Each structure stands twice: as C-alpha cells, then as structure tokens.
Amino acid sequence: MKVIFTEDVKGRGKRGEIKNVPDGYAQNFLIPRGKAKEANKAAMSELAGQERSREKHEAEELAAAKELKKVLEDDKTVVELTGKAGTDGRMFGSVSTKQIATALEKQYQIKLDKRKMELAAPIRALGYVNVPVKLHHDVEATLRVHIAEK
C-alpha cells in the first residue's frame, strides 16, 4: 500500500515522503496513529500544494534576508555602544550579542535575534568591530559595531 508520511517514522520514512509499505503495517499502525495517510489522488495533490507553498515561503524568507543584508552592510549602518574602559582601551565589562541586538533595534528599528550573531567571544575592547550575522542558511551579513568610552 502506498502511503504519504505525515511525520518522521524511524526506519520507514520522513515527513512528506511517498513510500510503499505492507498493507497491515499501514492499516494497523501508521494510519490510526496519524503517522501516515493513504496516497490517493486528493492526498497527492494536497502534498504537491503544500510543497509549492513551502517553496514560495522559503523564497520569500531568502529575499527578506538578502534585503536585510543590504541594510546591515550599508556604510551608514553602524551600531553605537558605550561602556566604561580603562586607560589602555580595554573595557571593564564586555559587550554581548544581546546588547548589540537591543542597540540595533533602538537605533535602526531592525529587530534581530541575538542568537543569529556569531561572536567567538564577548567584545572587550573599544573601537570598531565586525560582527558576523547569520540571517538565513544561505545569507550571512557583517554588522559594524562601534564601541566608545562613556
């Protein structure tokens, strides 16, 4: 019997796959538990529609990420932060991704998740720092951050 998996089933198939499984396994286990449904014409067309809408949604996300990359990498987009520092230019604390995300939202009205910023270590020095930002699995931008002394 051909079925369309509605969720991942270990050793059998992944969500959205169409596979041939034994009749008893499909009728007694997969279909009653909602893990699969019979692959008839209506279900096949529904799956194709879902696939098209998912692809369209991914394309929109990619376009939005590319647009945001243009804004973030613009020369005028520099996130300004201040902190207390010693005479040698080293800060008494550090600047985290949360502070950068908050400042970016306040200064440019761009809401960005702090987990998308990839800092190897917190920023502890004054001056300009380039922070890599992963906007999409295909799009990575660089955000300029300027840290000045209070």
Swiss-Prot record:
InterPro entries referenced in this protein's UniProt entry, alphabetically: Ribosomal_bL9, Ribosomal_bL9/RNase_H1_N, Ribosomal_bL9_bac/chp, Ribosomal_bL9_C, Ribosomal_bL9_C_sf, Ribosomal_bL9_N, Ribosomal_bL9_N_sf
SUPFAM superfamilies per record: L9 N-domain-like, Ribosomal protein L9 C-domain
GO cellular component: ribonucleoprotein complex; ribosome
Pfam families per the UniProt record, alphabetical: Ribosomal_L9_C, Ribosomal_L9_N
Keyword Ribosomal protein found: yes
GO molecular function: rRNA binding; structural constituent of ribosome
Source taxon at top rank: Bacteria
Keyword Transport among UniProt keywords: no
A Gene Ontology biological process term: translation
Keyword entries, A-Z: Ribonucleoprotein, Ribosomal protein, RNA-binding, rRNA-binding
HAMAP family in alphabetical order: Ribosomal_bL9
Family indicated by similarity: Belongs to the bacterial ribosomal protein bL9 family.
PANTHER family: 50S RIBOSOMAL PROTEIN L9 (PTHR21368)
Stated role: Binds to the 23S rRNA.
Protein name from the UniProt record: Large ribosomal subunit protein bL9
Organism whose genome encodes this protein: Limosilactobacillus fermentum (strain NBRC 3956 / LMG 18251) (Lactobacillus fermentum)
Gene name tied to this protein: rplI
